Amino acid sequence: PRLDLLDMPRYNGSGFGVGIITKLAQAYYQTADSEKFSGQDWRIRPVEEVIEEVRNLNTEFGIQKVFFIDSGFNIPMSSAKTLCKAIIETGLRIRWNTYLRPGECDAELTGLMKESGCSLVLFAEGRSESSVTGRLKQIGNLADLCREVELPFTLNITFGEPGETGHSVQQKIDFLDNTAPAFATTRVGARVLPNTQMAQVALNEGLIKSESDLLKPTFYVAPDVRGWIADRLREESKKHPRWHLS
């Protein structure tokens, strides 16, 4: 890309930094079927290429903050560790951020991430567990690993997914309170994507007539919470300055 045509120094002081791709694959969406994020179509970028791009951004434009574009940087964990070790060994002094997906992670990886310059981790609800309790436990385990190495993290929690009730809403709010992320995004409604279980639910309940309707952004909110969930989250956001309602 012709980065020389852009005002690159501005990236050092805003946002998450300049994006660098570390892996190409089918995108991971928390509302999509989890088995589609299996890794069979992954194309992991060679570590040498990633390191070279980081180095060029630094030497040519003075960029010291980058964002590793990856829906699940920690998957596979071996590749994530290899990249972190390479950053450390080459002496690149950068700050970087990325997404982690609940599941495949350990203390060695979060320690390497911190040592290699990671300053913020973003993660959302996983879908390998069907129950709210199971998914929140996965997120909590990942949060504990980050907290042990003083690695700040953010949370994105969806409210209104199929089966959502007043009880599960309270579960999620209590979880956010207890986990205390650097900041949190609470989302009203789950995005409906084609060829997913969510799309079938939307069809069954008459939210859409066919999947062609999904050419326009469509969100599902469970009937039990539809009438009040937005107001409830708005009130919670007022009490928690670091919670953002989306």
Please describe what each predicted stretch is.
Residues 1-154, 159, 174:
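Radical SAM [4Fe-4S] cluster-binding motif and immediate context
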Residues 29, 75-77, 165, 192-196:
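Short catalytic/ligand-binding loop motif for oxyanion handling, primarily in non-cytosolic enzymes
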Residues 161-163:
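Short, solvent-exposed loop/turn segments at secondary-structure junctions
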Residues 7, 17-19, 152, 167-246:
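C-terminal accessory regions of radical SAM enzymes
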